[in-house]
UniProtKB/Swiss-Prot annotation:
GO terms for molecular function: RNA binding. NCBIfam families: PRK05422.1, smpB. This is SsrA-binding protein. Its main location: cytoplasm. Residues 135-151 have a biased composition (Basic and acidic residues). One of its GO terms (cellular component) is cytosol. It is found in: Cytoplasm. Coiled coil: none annotated.
Amino acid sequence: MAEKNERAIKVVAENRKARFNYAIDDTIEVGIALTGTEVKSIRNGKTTIAESYADARGSEIWLINANIPEYLQANRFNHEPKRPRKLLLHRKQINKLIGAVEREGMTLIPLKLYFNERGRAKLQLALAKGKKLHDKRETEKKRDWSREKGRLLRSRG
């Protein structure tokens, strides 16, 4: 039997500031509804999701403010770079996320945009709560101390 052409997960965009600015409670993998030129542009790797967030509009969840630049080889049928994009979830997942956002004051933050093994664009969405300034400082102190410990152990060993 012929061997399958296996693809690894390819992370295209990552929101690195999210783990510093938010206390992440839960993560979920969601699909994203895209046009053809958007998929091609994402594959080029110029996408940014750092300033983006997800919001409930009606009974659907949308990705707001994600920047997927226009595909350079496309002609007049190109897409709008910062348009809202629909996220694809099951109804129970949507209800759970909407409930957490409305009742508990949580926020939906995208962490990663990637292509899975089947070549589909997926988004790792986090249910998070914003950190206060003193929490951010504490996180930074812990990170600095762990780096310093590593340096001390390496210099001794």
